[in-house]
């Protein structure tokens, strides 16, 4: 049985996650070096192509129509606008261009326009990723026809804690969409958010869910919550840095071939904490000044840090 086909148990993951920190880092970094270049990062850019007024009630999200936040509603961008942003992203060093829309599920009438975006971005030589909410099998097939490389659909947290964060959909709805994406032949990008009020046990169950998928996600984004004023989680306690590193290291051990993306929350991290995350197995980041609606480290800050650490762009 291959590493990716192993069925992990909670006790397996507890033993990994809770071992002495130095032992955990050593194990994770050893695996990381086996499967990846430890001194290279994948650069991606994320663009909000349709912003705000989402009917879902995710307790962390600035784009939910249930809460009054700083986000202003914006309609779906034109293909031309998206392609201009993609060109700028490529000039800035991005290799993958991710497009996010604040929908529960995309309206069928938008699919032709979305397909044009995919085709246009691919023609620039960029990998494509979309996150549009729940997808039917038919919609996933249409996106695949256009050449979509990745679809992001995060499970956010553990199955046990999920309904404390979102009530307008079920955890099983997330899994259904992931199955539709996988069946269409699109690579899966799936991770979650730390700092939603979950326990360590929830984080372990969250990792168990990802690692025990029939095929683990090719890309696993790990977000550190950016509290947004106006949302139910605006005052959530920030997850400790060491806990973040433990989560990344455990993800690397459980899913050795996956890209582990250090995503939201980097603006609040010290250089030293980011360095630990990369040592533990994170090998992908979003570059640019925005992550959908929230700030991201400015390019020059990223460049300075990556130069200090000797990290280069993944070829």
Curated annotation (Swiss-Prot):
Pathway membership: Cofactor biosynthesis; biotin biosynthesis; biotin from 7,8-diaminononanoate: step 2/2
Sequence positions that bind [4Fe-4S] cluster: 54, 58, 61
Cofactor: [4Fe-4S] cluster; [2Fe-2S] cluster
Positions bound to [2Fe-2S] cluster: 98, 129, 189, 261
Cofactor binding comment, as recorded: Binds 1 [4Fe-4S] cluster. The cluster is coordinated with 3 cysteines and an exchangeable S-adenosyl-L-methionine.
SMART domains per record: BATS, Elp3
TM spans (from-to): none
Any single GO BP term: biotin biosynthetic process
Keyword annotations from UniProtKB, A to Z: 2Fe-2S, 4Fe-4S, Biotin biosynthesis, Iron, Iron-sulfur, Metal-binding, S-adenosyl-L-methionine, Transferase
One GO MF term attached to the UniProt entry: biotin synthase activity
Record's catalysed reaction(s): (4R,5S)-dethiobiotin + (sulfur carrier)-SH + 2 reduced [2Fe-2S]-[ferredoxin] + 2 S-adenosyl-L-methionine = (sulfur carrier)-H + biotin + 2 5'-deoxyadenosine + 2 L-methionine + 2 oxidized [2Fe-2S]-[ferredoxin]
Domain Radical SAM core: 39-266
Enzyme Commission code(s) on record: 2.8.1.6
UniProt-listed NCBIfam families: bioB (TIGR00433)
Quaternary assembly: Homodimer.
PANTHER family: BIOTIN SYNTHASE (PTHR22976), BIOTIN SYNTHASE, MITOCHONDRIAL (PTHR22976:SF2)
Role: Catalyzes the conversion of dethiobiotin (DTB) to biotin by the insertion of a sulfur atom into dethiobiotin via a radical-based mechanism.
Protein name as annotated: Biotin synthase
Source species: Legionella pneumophila subsp. pneumophila (strain Philadelphia 1 / ATCC 33152 / DSM 7513)
Lineage: Bacteria, Pseudomonadati, Pseudomonadota, Gammaproteobacteria, Legionellales
Gene that this polypeptide is encoded by: bioB
């Amino acid at each position: 049985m291959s590493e990716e086909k192993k069925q992990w148990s909670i006790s397996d993951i507890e033993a990994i996650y809770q071992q002495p920190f130095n032992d955990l880092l050593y194990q994770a970094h050893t695996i990381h070096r086996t499967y990846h270049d430890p001194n290279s990062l994948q650069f991606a850019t994320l663009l909000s192509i349709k912003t705000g007024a989402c009917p879902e009630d995710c307790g962390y999200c600035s784009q939910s129509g249930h809460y009054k936040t700083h986000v202003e509603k914006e309609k779906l961008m034109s293909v031309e606008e998206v392609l201009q942003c993609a060109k700028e992203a490529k000039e800035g060093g991005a290799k993958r261009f991710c497009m996010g829309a604040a929908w529960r599920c995309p309206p069928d009438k938008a699919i032709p326009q979305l397909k044009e975006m995919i085709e246009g971005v691919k023609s620039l030589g960029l990998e494509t990723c979309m996150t549009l909410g729940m997808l039917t099998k038919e919609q996933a097939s249409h996106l695949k026809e256009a050449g979509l490389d990745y679809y992001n659909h995060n499970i956010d947290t553990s199955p046990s804690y999920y309904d404390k964060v979102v009530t307008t959909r079920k955890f099983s709805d997330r899994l259904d969409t992931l199955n539709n994406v996988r069946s269409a032949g699109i690579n899966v990008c799936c991770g979650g958010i730390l700092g939603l009020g979950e326990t360590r046990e929830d984080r372990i169950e969250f990792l168990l869910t990802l690692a025990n998928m029939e095929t683990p996600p090719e890309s696993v984004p790990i977000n550190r919550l950016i509290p947004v004023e106006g949302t139910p989680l605006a005052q959530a306690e920030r997850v400790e840095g060491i806990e973040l590193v433990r989560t990344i290291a455990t993800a690397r051990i459980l899913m050795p071939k996956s890209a582990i993306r250090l995503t939201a929350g980097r603006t609040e991290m010290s250089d030293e904490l980011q360095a630990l995350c990369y040592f533990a197995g994170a090998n992908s980041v979003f570059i640019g000044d925005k992550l959908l609606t929230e700030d991201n480290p400015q390019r020059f800050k990223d460049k300075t840090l990556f130069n200090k650490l000797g990290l280069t762009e993944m070829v």
